[in-house]
């Protein structure tokens, strides 16, 4: 472990970008496994495209963006953490979401490379604000700067799994499924007294 940390400190760009790109590709494989039947093969061409977008753009963008924002608002003081998170969501998030949708549309050879972006940007952005505000608050508060891109890569693994899922589906279908899932989750988490309240009264 000590050797890995030393290597990361000596070669932060190589380590962080490699980890980030690999996690991007892995996220697509997980998404395919979860959404396909067990007999359907993995589309490794699609995985390669996701990994390419992650490695060429997202990994490099986040590496240099995190260094820039740390120099602009140094340290982990609460006010600076708030500034970093706000800048990240207002400036970086729209860029990375746009790059994901348009980049994959270009690699897929779609005629209208902005179609997915126009349809899914706002739902994706609003969901991302809820997730990434938490991820980045932790990142800027307690994660050492030299491993921040790798940490964001782990968070991006979860986020990219979601992005790959909704990219290949109608946004209304995804929204409907989420809305149906919420009552089911709530029902499973109901407290005993809530369940008792739903029982018919004894005659």
Swiss-Prot record:
Primary location class: membrane
Transmembrane ranges, per UniProt, are 13-30, 50-69, 90-107, 144-166
Q: Which GO CC terms are listed, alphabetically?
A: cytoplasm; mitochondrion; peroxisomal membrane
Give the location in the cell. Peroxisome membrane
- What keywords does the record list, in alphabetical order? Membrane, Peroxisome, Transmembrane, Transmembrane helix
Determine the domain of life of the protein's source. Answer: Eukaryota
- One annotated GO biological process: mitochondrial ribosome assembly
Q: Which InterPro entries match?
A: Mpv17_PMP22 (IPR007248)
Q: Which residues lie on this side of the membrane: Lumenal?
A: 31-49, 108-143
Q: Which residue ranges does the entry give as Cytoplasmic-facing topology?
A: 1-12, 70-89, 167-203
Instruction: Give the family per the record.
Output: Belongs to the peroxisomal membrane protein PXMP2/4 family.
| Known function | Participates in reactive oxygen species metabolism by up- or down-regulation of the genes of antioxidant enzymes. Protective against the mitochondrial apoptotic cascade.
Q: What is this protein called?
A: Mpv17-like protein
Tell me the organism. Answer: Xenopus laevis
Q: Which gene encodes it?
A: mpv17l
């Amino acid at each position: 472990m000590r050797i890995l940390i030393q290597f990361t400190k000596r070669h932060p760009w190589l380590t962080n970008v490699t980890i980030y790109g690999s996690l991007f590709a892995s996220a697509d494989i997980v998404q395919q496994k979860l959404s396909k039947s067990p007999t359907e093969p993995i589309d490794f061409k699609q995985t390669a495209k996701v990994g390419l977008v992650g490695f060429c753009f997202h990994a490099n963008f986040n590496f240099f963006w995190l260094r820039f924002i740390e120099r602009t608002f140094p340290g982990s003081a609460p006010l600076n953490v708030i500034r970093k998170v706000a800048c990240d969501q207002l400036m970086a998030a729209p860029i990375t979401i746009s790059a994901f949708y348009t980049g994959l549309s270009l690699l897929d050879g779609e005629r209208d490379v902005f179609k997915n972006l126009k349809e899914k940007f706002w739902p994706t952005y609003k969901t991302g604000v809820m997730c990434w505000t938490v991820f980045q608050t932790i990142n800027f508060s307690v994660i050492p700067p030299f491993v921040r891109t790798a940490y964001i890569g782990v968070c991006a693994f979860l986020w990219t799994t979601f992005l790959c899922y909704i990219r290949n589906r109608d946004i209304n279908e995804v929204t409907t499924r989420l809305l149906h899932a919420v009552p089911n989750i709530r029902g499973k988490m109901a407290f005993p007294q809530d369940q008792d309240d739903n029982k018919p009264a004894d005659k």
